[in-house]
Amino acid sequence: MTRWLWVSIILTVLVTAGTVYVYFDPEFNALLPDPVPTHWNIHGQTDKWTPKAEVLPYFLIGPAAMGLLCLLTPLLPWLSPRQFSVEPFRKVYDYVMGLVVVLFAYLQGVILLASFEARGALINWLVGGIFVFFALLGNVLGQIRRNFWMGVRTPWTLASETVWNNTHRLAAWLFVGVGISGAVAVVIGVPLWICFAGIIIAALVPIFYSLWLYKRLEHEGKLDRSDLSAPATVGSDASGQR
């Protein structure tokens, strides 16, 4: 197992054990309000409450997602077709999967702390952590090669290695820029809806860019030769053998 997978497994065990302990320990349980706040809107206001006796499944959603990621980390490379293998960027793949687990661990801690107070005052910490994640992800986004599991996977990036690489270079700059500026914006008190607008822009621009770039290269006849070759049909194979 890789170092990042070990980190993910250890974090998952610790977060799961910590969550269960917080719920069942008499002292911590006594501090939980009843009902417990389990969802907050974009303004940090609680908009969903759950009876204390029924809140444990909500608390375990994060650890369950972390456990699923630990299972998928070694499984997805095995499932990948040879042409879209993650092996050429395996270290980056392991890093990204581990980074997502770390994000879930951080969010779990913030959510547990926020559950002890109805005002959801820690919402800025939650959003700020997401922006830091975007910046760290953007730092390696340009190193991800064509695959089916992570990155900007549009029909045009998957169809052309050139489009994939150029799109991910652009996405890397956008993610780092939005991640850093968004984290700073949260700290100085910019409204959260403005911060989230940056995430939407960073997610949509690479999609439209990949379409534009593919069509431009196609029009100019500059698509990779390997991208232009179509798989042979059964009929053509049979005729070629005769």
What are these regions (language model features)?
Residues L71-L122:
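Ordered, amphipathic secondary-structure segments that act as subunit-interaction surfaces
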Residues W40, G44, S80-S85, N147-T162, ...:
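Cytosolic, membrane-interface loops and tails of multi-pass inner-membrane proteins
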Residues V22-P57, M150-A159:
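Active-site and channel-lining beta-strand-loop segments
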Residues W4-L11, Y58-P63, L69-L71, Y93-L103, ...:
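Select subsegments of transmembrane alpha-helices in polytopic membrane proteins
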Residues F28, M66-S80, L136-V152, S210-E220:
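Membrane-water interface of transmembrane alpha-helices
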Residues K48-G67, G120-L137:
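Alpha-helical transmembrane segments
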Residues S8-Y23, P63-L75, A105-Q108, F133-A135, ...:
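Hydrophobic core of alpha-helical transmembrane segments in multi-pass integral membrane proteins
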Residues A105-A121, G177-I194:
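Alpha-helical transmembrane segments and their membrane-interface junctions
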